[in-house]
A protein has these predicted regions:
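C-terminal-of-GTPase-core extension/linker across diverse P-loop GTPases
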Residues: 2-6, 11, 17, 139, ...
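Short amphipathic alpha-helical patches
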Residues: 39-44, 75-76, 115, 122, ...
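Flexible beta-alpha connector loops of hexameric P-loop NTPases
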Residues: 74-79, 115-129, 149-154, 210-212
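Poly-acidic low-complexity segments
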Residues: 43-46, 102-103, 107-121, 153-156, ...
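Alpha-helix initiation/capping motif
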Residues: 45-46, 85, 118, 182, ...
């Protein structure tokens, strides 16, 4: 299992990575502090494993783990190669899940690439870039399917209809994880494409420390 930490530059991705993995990756007040992805490993607590260890007392215990990847920040136009866009999207493609960090605090001393703090806008920027990249991948696949259909590849008709539906879904500004996809279609058509917006997402809100114990905000 591999989870990638993503978000705009300078929102706290490397800080979260260090907290989760007990690492010391560079974290600084400027965009693209992270260029090459940092990778750390986190053990997964499992009470069932603890119980088994108590019963059989093995010589060695190997817990389940998750690889955490601190990925370079994304900016508008990443799907077209802006910033570190191509590298960013390639790194996400290699993960199984996304941890999306959103900056939710004000601090004049910490720059924001968009000039202001707006977590909903920031979320939409990342979502939009991932959707555009998936749209590009599906359009390329559609072109290949059409070539097969032109030479009598009737077995591609079902895939063509399916891909068309996904393209229309993305054009509405929706991610593919919100599209009802059966396991057979996923395994047959989508798994080889490793589409970005199919990956499950956990949103992490980076808030002001003063608000941590404030239940009213």
């Amino acid at each position: 299992m591999k989870a990638g930490i993503v978000g705009l530059p300078n929102v706290g991705k490397s800080t979260l990575f260090n907290c989760l993995t007990n690492s010391k990756a560079q974290s600084a007040n400027f965009p693209f502090c992270t260029i090459e992805p940092n990778v750390g490993v986190v053990n997964i607590p499992d009470t069932r494993l603890n119980r088994i260890v108590e019963l059989i007392e093995p010589e060695k215990v190997v817990p389940n783990t998750v690889d955490i990847v601190d990925i370079a920040g994304l900016v508008k136009g990443a799907s077209k190669g802006e910033g570190l866009g191509n590298q960013f999207l390639s790194n996400i493609r290699e993960t199984n899940a996304i941890i999306h960090v959103l900056r939710c605090y004000q601090n004049e001393n910490i720059t924001h690439v968009e000039g202001s703090v707006d977590p909903l806008r920031d979320k939409e920027i990342v979502d939009f870039e991932l959707q555009l990249k998936d749209l590009e991948s599906l359009e390329k696949r559609k072109e290949k399917i059409i070539k097969h259909l032109k030479i009598g590849g009737n077995e591609y008709k079902k895939e063509f209809v399916f891909v068309e539906q996904l393209i229309e879904h993305l054009k509405k500004g929706l991610s593919l994880r919100n599209f009802n996809i059966d396991s057979e279609s996923y395994e047959k058509y989508l798994k080889p494409l490793s589409l970005l917006t199919l990956k499950p997402v956990l949103y992490v809100c980076n808030i002001d420390e003063k608000l941590i114990n404030n239940n009213d905000q």
